Amino acid sequence: MVRFIEENTKLVEKETGNKSNNDVTTTKKKALQDIIINNGVGLINSWVDSMRACSPTHLKSLLKQSSWLTEHPSALDMFEEILHLSEGKQIVMFLDYDGTLSPIVDDPDRAFMSRKMRRTVRKLANCFPTAIVSGRCIEKVYNFVKLTELYYAGSHGMDIKGPEQGSKYEQILQDSKSLLCQPATEFLPMIDEVYHKLVEKTKSTPGAQVENNKFCVSVHFRRVDENNWSDLANQVRSVMKDYPKLRLTQGRKVLEVRPIIKWDKGKALEFLLESLGYANCTDVFPLYIGDDRTDEDAFKVLRERRQGLGILVSKFPKETSASYSLQEPDEVMEFLQRLVEWKQLRSGA
């Protein structure tokens, strides 16, 4: 366990101009990197374009939508196929929170999950080992979910804790209460410092909201007029240029400041599988459901392991490593309910 953490938390070497094409998959990612690492002031417009690309608000053509659904069919339509793939294997559930268990809302402090969704997740955790993997800090996501029997991976997997009580799977761990993984602890003072600087720097931009998620800082621009995105990008860049050990990633109308370490939601998934005793098992079937770019790290891990599958929550066609799709949290709940019903029937409950 300790070796797993040590091998995956080394600082990433500072990237140079000799970087291979494989390291950057899109021009937009390259533009973002140039702005943050190379102080590319002239590329702010490209960054804003990338912000738009990460926050789709318009319908794609029906032809493109149809083509995308052919490659990433509905997990509800393909439910029997998913069950067939999992036959004889232990299903382990990994769920993002915002946009997956709760709707995306303008005010991130009001991203409440419904009581019906909470009941569904509680039943799910009674059937399968279940983890919430979120960009929010553990304390915030727990205050939304309010289920002690789950595993929680906050701050994009940089803060992991086991269930406090009630999970029938906690016996798998030698001592689930001691399960704790915080690979970025040394960055806490730096993250806190950047948080306060970003609050001060962005206060002139109406609608901007800076959130301290313990091991990362989120700059929400969902309520920022698009005409002001460029100003906000400049404000964030002016702070980030003084912190080469931090990196910036993007999500659905949010900019995320994180330590440059080899740790993400994919690493969190692997850590939890190892903690549960499934690291080298062939009879385990991880199911990861998420809606954001940061969930792609977990989708890619599952593809590389050739084990389990990813389900993207999106109404719009997106480039993704997920195998299936669901359109919104209501569909996620229906999928989870069907999983629970299937398991209960199999168990004779």
From Swiss-Prot:
GO terms for molecular function: trehalose-phosphatase activity. It comes from the Eukaryota. It catalyses: alpha,alpha-trehalose 6-phosphate + H2O = alpha,alpha-trehalose + phosphate. Keywords: Hydrolase, Stress response. InterPro entries: HAD-like_sf, HAD-SF_hydro_IIB, HAD_sf, OTSB-like, Trehalose_PPase. Induction: By trehalose. CDD domains: HAD_TPP. GO terms for cellular component: cytosol; nucleus. It is an enzyme of class 3 (hydrolase). Its cofactor is a divalent metal cation. Pathway: Glycan biosynthesis; trehalose biosynthesis. One of its GO terms (biological process) is trehalose biosynthetic process. The keyword Acyltransferase does not apply. Its EC number is 3.1.3.12. Belongs to the trehalose phosphatase family. Removes the phosphate from trehalose 6-phosphate to produce free trehalose. Trehalose accumulation in plant may improve abiotic stress tolerance. This is Probable trehalose-phosphate phosphatase H.
